[in-house]
Regions:
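Mid/C-terminal beta-alpha module of Rossmann-like enzyme folds, strongest
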Residues: 203-296, 309, 358-363
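Glycine-rich Rossmann NAD(P)(H)-binding loop
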Residues: 6-7, 182-187, 215-222, 233, ...
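Active-site "gating" loop of Rossmann-like NAD(P)-dependent oxidoreductase/epimerase domains
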Residues: 98-123, 138-143, 160
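Amphipathic terminal alpha-helices
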Residues: 324-363
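Substrate-positioning beta->alpha
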Residues: 163-169, 182-205, 212-213, 226-227
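NAD(P)-cofactor binding segment of oxidoreductase domains
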Residues: 63-110, 130-137
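N-terminal Rossmann NAD(P)H-binding glycine-rich loop of SDR-like oxidoreductase domains
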Residues: 3-23
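Conserved beta-loop-beta element that borders a ligand/cofactor-binding pocket
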Residues: 133-159
């Protein structure tokens, strides 16, 4: 199949390009051409800044595609223009969304028919992803535009452009640092391996059953916060020095009753957000660096958040190949192969503040 990946040079997009090329697809990527990366042999490169409508029109002119995977659409105007340019010229348009769209729920797992969150607590990223999905559903229903939306949850694996997730945990354990765990460590979460997610996206291609539908895409296994730490420690081969943050202190940190000095954050992602989070929300996101958590602006620190993937299994025949321990093992092997066990630099000052508070906390 003739496929186009919007982006295609970092993490999710790069894994998808490699998966498609491995299975014989004629793959093109479209991006600004600024990220140095080795792509599989035969992958064609189209260059344009998608925020420049004229440049995007020129780059896509005279092309038809069997499938277009849009990994870099963050705003409604992105998908509006893609629908305009691709109408009648694409067999399937797959929009990569995010599970941040969903409202908090006490019923788990969260499936595709659960309510989305349009409340004031939703952030700009989530609001705009919802608007993108709304538009594509209308386009499919009213004009037959062959669109599918795929919300990803926390993605895990080699080349992650958010080093403060799994890579930071490897670094903590290797440095012998205390491992901070929120509350009693029983809260459940879930990640998906980037290569499993690339396979799922490939398997969705040109399946008419998926048109106009949403598919959650993440791992099949859940883990507790303490289980997350224990799994990492077993893979790294160390005994973790676990420090449990008292629930009362976590409540104070989440509510902003205790505010700490900020630390540097490692990230290479640009979601073109114009919104700047307030100090309390920023602190909540810093807390998710301790043990991975999704959407702390919506979900309280001690609320389990997991997503169902049964629809994807049923309609595309996909199932994850990586268990959670296998995903950690695979990612740690990559981490060491890249020399990150020696070169990754982390700012621990914020964690040190939390550690001091946890040790001195009076119940």
């Amino acid at each position: 199949m003739k496929t186009l990946v919007m982006g295609g040079t970092q993490f999710n997009g790069l894994a998808l390009v490699r998966e498609l090329a491995k299975h014989g697809h004629a793959v093109s990527v479209l991006n600004r051409g600024k990220t140095p990366v080795e792509l599989p042999l035969g992958v064609a490169r189209l260059t344009a800044d998608r925020t420049d409508g004229a440049a995007l029109r020129a780059a896509l002119a005279n092309h038809d595609w069997d499938v277009v995977y849009d990994v870099t659409a963050y705003r409604p105007e992105d998908v509006h223009l893609m629908a305009e340019l691709l109408r009648g010229r694409v067999g399937h348009y797959v929009f990569v969304s995010s599970t941040v769209i969903y409202a908090p729920s006490d019923r788990l797992p969260i499936s595709e028919d659960f309510p989305v969150d349009r409340s004031p607590q939703q952030n700009e990223y989530g609001r705009l992803k919802i608007e993108c999905e709304d538009f594509l559903v209308r386009e499919q229903r009213e004009r037959g535009f062959p669109a599918t939306t795929v919300p990803l949850s926390m993605v895990f694996g080699p080349n992650n452009i958010l080093p403060d997730r799994e890579q930071r945990m490897f670094a903590r354990l290797l440095a012998g640092r205390p491992i901070l765990i929120p509350g009693d460590g029983s809260t459940l979460a879930q990640v998906g391996h980037v290569e499993d997610q690339a396979r799922a996206l490939r398997m969705l291609a040109q399946n008419p059953r998926t048109f106009g539908r949403r598919y959650n895409l993440t791992g099949a296994h859940y883990f507790s916060a303490e289980g997350y730490v224990d799994t990492f420690a077993a893979v790294v081969g160390v005994a973790p020095n676990k420090v449990f943050i008292p629930a009362g202190l976590m409540d104070d940190l989440y509510a902003g009753r205790v505010l700490l000095a900020r630390a540097a954050v490692n990230a290479k992602v640009d979601i073109r957000s114009k919104e700047r989070a307030g100090e309390i929300i920023q602190q909540r996101f810093l807390l998710t660096m301790l043990v991975q958590r999704i959407a702390p602006h919506l979900h309280h620190w001690n609320k389990s958040v997991v997503f169902g993937v049964d629809r994807l299994r049923e309609d595309a025949g996909w199932k994850p190949e990586f268990s959670f321990p296998a995903a950690v093992e695979h990612t740690y092997a990559w981490f060491r192969s890249q020399g990150l066990h020696e070169s990754l630099k982390c700012d621990w000052s914020w964690e040190d503040q939390v550690l001091a508070l946890a040790r001195d906390y009076k119940h």
